Amino acid sequence: MPELPEVETVRRTLKNFVLNKRIISIDVIYPKIIEDDIEEFKNKVCNQVINDIDRIGKFLIFKLDDVAFVSHLRMEGKYHYVNSDEPLNKHDHIIFNLDDGKQLRYNDTRKFGRMKLVSLDNYANELPLSKLGPEPFYADEKKLYEKLHKCNLPIKHALLDQSIIAGIGNIYANEICFAMGLDPYTPASKLTKKSVKELIEVASNILNEAIKQGGTTIHSFSANGIDGLFQVKLKVHLQKKCPICGGEITKEAIKGR
């Protein structure tokens, strides 16, 4: 699943291609991707210019003239900016036809991704974005400590809870726990104020470094066909030996993750 660094990489890449392009029409091949009424979505989005693309957590926000829409890539969603005469891939589900004669195609092998209309000026306070916690970069130490202090979930599971802290998924939760020397099974409520401060710093540093490397390319992630490089810096996720002691890394699921 694309996490914060991967979605940020997609955002930056897409801005290079589609900013200031007008959406002429939309072809909806798999309607369930769009949570709104299809005709309403088309009517509000068509003939609008893509003025900016924002990101909150793992969500992209396409900011148009009068409206915006949220795009959640979920497990394997991705965008391709292609010539309009390029043959459709069987996993291309939403096609945005642009005024430069090209197409922005939403491709999703699993079909789990979703799009939803939101207001242009207040989208952060509307669902699904309003239920998100802060990203590590903006987390308040005191508020995060109070949240975790009331949480008896394993710390790794708490890191995956987007209402507590936004943008972290399985890959970076593993890396954060390792960098802190923190047992993933440790109850979140056991973290001290000092540990929470360290957690914010470590998480921010790891995510920032991953963004610099263009994210982690594992399985299906790429930004318009451009792979990220952070996978070569992973310490424990999908690794076999500990980079510090050389011991074998064992894989265990925590709350199914």
Language model features with spans:
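Alpha-helical structural motif
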Residues: 3-6, 10, 19, 37, ...
